[in-house]
Amino acid sequence: MLGWTLMFLVVAIIAGLFGFTGIAGAAAGIAKIIFFLFIVLLVISLLVNAIKGRAPRP
């Protein structure tokens, strides 16, 4: 789950870079939403793994 979250976070960051630099101006709003959504998912995933006491899979 953490791997998927990190992958989608990277995709959101790349989409955000395109949106914020004017390459895809219409996608900037969507990229902002996706970026913050996956930041939240990353934090939740890290907390769940910390509570369970497991190390993330390599």
From Swiss-Prot:
Signal peptide: none annotated. This is UPF0391 membrane protein Sputw3181_2781. It is found in: Cell membrane. GO terms for cellular component: plasma membrane. Belongs to the UPF0391 family. The chain crosses the membrane at residues 6-26, 28-48. The keyword Transmembrane applies. HAMAP family: UPF0391. InterPro entries: DUF1328. It comes from the Bacteria. It is a multi-pass membrane protein. Keywords: Cell membrane, Membrane, Transmembrane, Transmembrane helix. It holds the Pfam family DUF1328. The keyword Transmembrane applies.
